[in-house]
């Protein structure tokens, strides 16, 4: 489904804390805009890539792909945007004086398999070739949730499972 700046938030029923808190913050900001308490715009970036983000969540798997040590890929997709493009949009949005607007910062839609294949090709290694079924990913997410509940960390949690299969 193609989304634009007027598209409603449709994943609240999944209980994805990361997405829900970003959405709730945007609602609070736009409520204040509509009450003429502040001037603001919203920038909704897709998955941002650029220098300095190698320790960010999903980057661990991508680094393993680049090293030829990750044979798996999930069934989901991702939209990627470079950090420089997001910064440019922020500057343009600030200068636009269009109070209360929302802007989507995005690039190309790719499957995660396509993303991993591109990473492997650039690194000169074999791309992942084993598709992980959703059931396996969600099972790993539940195990990760359980480990988090006792103060440890699993490979993924339920939020990661959802986002890697969307």
What annotation goes with each model-predicted range?
Residues 1-13, 34, 53, 63-66:
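Active-site "gating" loop of Rossmann-like NAD(P)-dependent oxidoreductase/epimerase domains
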Residues 89-155:
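Mid/C-terminal beta-alpha module of Rossmann-like enzyme folds, strongest
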Residues 10-18, 72-76:
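A short acidic, glycine-rich active-site loop
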Residues 13-42:
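Active-site Tyr-X1-5-Lys
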């Amino acid at each position: 489904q193609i989304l634009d700046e007027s598209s409603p938030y449709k994943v609240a029923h999944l209980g994805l804390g990361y997405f829900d808190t970003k959405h709730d913050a945007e609602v609070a900001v736009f409520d204040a805009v509509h009450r003429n308490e502040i001037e603001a715009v919203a920038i909704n970036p897709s998955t941002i890539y650029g220098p300095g983000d190698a320790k960010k969540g999903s980057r661990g798997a991508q680094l393993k792909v680049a090293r030829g040590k990750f044979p798996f890929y999930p069934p989901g997709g991702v939209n990627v945007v470079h950090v420089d493009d997001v910064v440019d949009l922020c500057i343009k949005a600030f200068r636009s004086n269009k109070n209360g607007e929302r802007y989507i910062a995005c690039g190309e839609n790719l499957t995660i398999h396509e993303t991993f294949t591109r990473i492997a090709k650039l690194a000169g290694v074999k791309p992942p070739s084993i598709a992980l079924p959703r059931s396996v990913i969600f099972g790993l997410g539940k195990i990760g949730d359980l480990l988090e509940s006792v103060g440890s960390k699993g490979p993924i949690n339920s939020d990661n499972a959802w986002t890697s299969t969307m």
